[in-house]
Design a protein with these regions (language model features):
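Polytopic alpha-helical membrane-helix bundles and their juxtamembrane interface segments
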Residues: 2-89, 98-256
Length: 256
């Protein structure tokens, strides 16, 4: 498997004449910082345009990208200095990934009913992040590296299973626009979060493995944090549009 990964990485080692994986990864740190900052401004500016019961969701979206923007600013500087920003990245994840999971019960309006579900999701998430960190700082390819990586993968799969098997009734009971958004958001957890373990395995690819791993992480963070928030936003706005149309259609009947 290591040989296959090394062969795959070799084809990417030099994207063009002087643009190496290392320099491309550095640029992506700053691009991610800009994307997170722009998304934060957008989410907070648009907060007042969504129905009041969904404004907390927009606040959470803005917090996720705002926290990530700060961390990416710091991580870019650390990477520029020749080190991998592992600690900063995991601090970011331990804060932002639970916030991402909070958005499911918020959008579905589960209230107190969602506390047990949320506690389960957050507990699994923290196990995933903690074990992934231990794997990350272990010797690459060693027994501890693989063992903790596999535990983190199991925790991630349990998060996916929880979202797909314990929220079915709540999704069916939600308005169509919200249920559609939640289904897409589940897809982000299923597919988007799968980029992280793939990126983790890039460390096996040789001299550029660490930079390639960071590149995967950067791309995944932008897709998941910005995209996740935008899906929630457009779902809420679609529902608001339908509710507005229904109110307008009912007004002539009321006046008659």
């Amino acid at each position: 498997m290591s040989v296959l990964l090394a062969d795959a990485a070799a084809s990417y080692t030099s994207v063009s004449g002087s643009l190496t994986i290392e320099s491309l990864t550095y640029y992506l740190f700053w691009l991610a910082c800009v994307c997170m900052g722009a998304a934060t401004v957008f989410f907070f500016l648009e907060r007042s345009s969504v129905p009041s019961k969904y404004r907390t969701t927009m606040t959470v979206s803005g917090l996720i990208t705002g926290i990530a923007c700060f961390h990416y600013f710091r991580m870019a500087a650390i990477y520029e200095g020749g080190s991998f920003p592992t600690e900063y990245r995991y601090i970011d994840w331990v804060i932002t990934t639970p916030l991402m999971l909070i958005k499911f019960p918020l959008l579905l309006g589960l209230g107190s009913k969602g506390k047990k579900l949320l506690a389960q999701l957050v507990a699994l998430d923290l196990v995933m992040i903690a074990t992934a960190y231990v794997a990350e700082v272990s010797p690459v390819g060693g027994g501890q590296w693989w063992a903790f990586f596999l535990v983190a993968c199991v925790a991630e799969l349990l998060i996916v299973a929880t979202l797909y098997f314990q929220m079915t009734d709540a999704i069916l009971d939600a308005p169509h626009q919200i249920s559609k958004a939640v289904r897409v958001m589940r897809g982000f957890i299923l597919v988007g979060w799968a980029i992280y373990p793939i990126g983790f395995l890039m460390a096996l690819t040789g001299d550029s493995g660490g930079a390639l791993r960071e590149l995967f992480y950067n791309v995944a963070d932008v897709i998941n944090k910005v995209g996740f928030g935008l899906v929630a936003y457009y779902g809420v706005m679609a529902l608001a549009k339908v509710e507005r149309s229904m109110r307008l259609s009912e007004e002539p009947l009321a006046s008659a």
